[in-house]
UniProtKB/Swiss-Prot annotation:
Domain PINc: 2-123
GO MF, one example: RNA nuclease activity
Co-factor(s): Mg(2+)
Biological role stated in the UniProt entry: Toxic component of a type II toxin-antitoxin (TA) system. An RNase. Upon expression in M.smegmatis inhibits colony formation. Its toxic effect is neutralized by coexpression with cognate antitoxin VapB35.
A biological-process GO annotation: negative regulation of growth
Listed transmembrane segments: none
InterPro entries, A to Z: PIN-like_dom_sf, PIN_dom, VapC_family
The name this protein goes by in its record: Ribonuclease VapC35
Keywords: Hydrolase, Magnesium, Metal-binding, Nuclease, Toxin-antitoxin system
Record gene name: vapC35
Gene3D superfamilies xrefs: 5'-nuclease (3.40.50.1010)
Length: 135
């Protein structure tokens, strides 16, 4: 499984510096299931509306490629318990969703371009990638 956080999904709709590298990275892993949080249904539309409203018609097709995990009690309690005060609430939900999904089936990577989320995920020993991002 590949967990795609909203900052990555935006790059599949709006052309950004990392868009081609991300698309190539995903194309090399077509056998893996794409997953995300149900939160992404709202977050992706809001992000695209803010930065590239002409991309809104592409949101449903991107979401259709993803299996979405509901924000259930386990995910909520996991997200609430993270000790890092710099981890924002929505990022904590993404992290808890990825961590919970990874406890059920192998998680190849969490794809994010958000540095705070990246650091929090790496602290939990999750594999994090940001194809095309300069280190």
């Amino acid at each position: 499984m590949i967990y795609l956080e909203t900052s990555a999904l935006v790059k599949l709709i709006r052309i950004e510096v990392e868009s081609d590298a991300l698309a190539d990275w995903l194309d090399d892993r077509t056998e893996l299931r794409w997953i995300t949080s149900a939160l992404t249904e709202v977050e992706l539309s809001r992000a695209i509306r803010a930065v590239s409203p002409e991309g809104l018609p592409a949101v449903p097709s991107v979401l259709a490629r993803l299996d979405r995990f509901e924000i259930d009690a386990v995910i909520r309690s996991t997200a609430a318990a993270y000790p890092n005060p710099a981890l924002r609430s929505l990022d904590a939900i993404h992290l808890a969703t990825a961590q919970t999904a990874g406890s059920v089936a192998p998680l190849t990577a969490l794809v994010t371009y958000d540095n705070r989320l990246k650091e929090a995920a790496e602290a939990l020993s999750l594999a994090v990638v940001a194809p095309g991002q300069a280190r």
